[in-house]
């Protein structure tokens, strides 16, 4: 089985450097690290020139799209398993990839194959209190394997998955034609919904952990919530009949 890690990057900082170092220490080392870098001027070519298996593809800010850019990265990948990450998500330990693969090997309650397995997000040391509570709410320590049948009890959270750190089976990804293009947000949840509609399951794997949190200003949080609402409105086939109040309203990527 082959594994690629695919990372959209924009103005990478020390967290990205730490992410790459932790990928090199994994018990299951990725075959390739595919970087989709927005704006070549921000890329430190000398700093990452000698990373085994790393390849970098540059695009402009105007070309970036949450779904489309990840689809292009998937097209470059030839692996059995693709792990999408963001450039500020740092593996907590050396077992991240190993545990995500175990998550993909699980089955749903009726024997459904798992198409998607996403990791637990832990707050960084400088994370504010409200963000810590949100992380604990959305990423508990209890594993889950979700299917379409859970919509009646879980509402919108049935489809929750996060490309901050998320593993996909390449054969199913191709069968479902990947992510939606030209989406402002939520390409991961829209894909999870499509996978469940096709009879697959989505696994939450708390043993797979990344450090990832934000200290957003009120205005930044407003824009984030606005983008979330727009993406839901643009895809009524997924979100129209789902409850988004209560626990769902607190979703944070």
Feature locations, PLM:
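Conserved donor NDP-sugar-binding/catalytic core segment of glycosyltransferases
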Residues: 95-132
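Acidic donor-binding loop at a coil-to-helix junction in glycosyltransferase catalytic cores
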Residues: 184-191
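Active-site-adjacent helix/loop segment of glycosyltransferases
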Residues: 202, 208-253
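Glycine-rich, basic loop-to-helix element that forms the pyrophosphate-binding segment
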Residues: 60-77
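Short, well-formed alpha-helical segments that are part of the catalytic scaffolds
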Residues: 12-25
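A recurrent flexible, glycine/aromatic-enriched loop bordering the glycosyltransferase active site
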Residues: 148-168, 184
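Short beta-strand/loop segment that forms part of the nucleotide-sugar
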Residues: 30-40, 57-59
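Short aromatic/hydrophobic "clamp" motif used to bind/position activated sugar donors
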Residues: 82
């Amino acid at each position: 089985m082959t594994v690629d890690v695919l990372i959209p990057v924009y103005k990478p900082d020390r967290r990205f450097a730490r992410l790459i170092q932790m990928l090199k220490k994994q018990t299951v080392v990725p075959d390739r690290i595919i970087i989709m870098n927005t704006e070549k001027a921000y890329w430190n070519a000398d700093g990452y020139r000698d990373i085994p298996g790393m390849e970098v593809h540059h695009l402009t800010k105007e070309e970036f799209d949450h779904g489309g850019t990840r689809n292009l990265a998937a097209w470059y990948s030839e692996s059995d398993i693709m792990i999408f990450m963001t450039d500020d998500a740092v593996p907590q330990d050396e077992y991240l990839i190993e545990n995500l693969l175990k998550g993909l090997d699980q089955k749903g309650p009726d024997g459904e194959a798992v198409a998607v397995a996403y990791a637990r997000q832990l707050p960084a040391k400088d994370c504010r209190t409200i963000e810590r509570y949100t992380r604990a709410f959305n990423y508990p320590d209890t594993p889950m394997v979700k299917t379409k049948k859970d919509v009646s009890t879980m509402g919108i959270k049935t489809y929750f998955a996060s490309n901050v750190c998320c593993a996909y089976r390449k054969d199913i990804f191709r069968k479902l034609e990947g992510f939606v293009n030209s989406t402002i947000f939520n390409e991961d949840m829209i894909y999870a919904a499509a996978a469940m509609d096709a009879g697959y399951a989505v696994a939450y794997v708390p043993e797979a952990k990344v450090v990832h949190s934000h200290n957003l200003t009120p205005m930044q949080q407003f824009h984030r919530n606005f983008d979330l609402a727009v993406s839901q409105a643009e895809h009524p086939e997924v979100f129209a009949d789902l409850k988004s109040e209560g626990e769902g309203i607190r979703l944070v990527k």
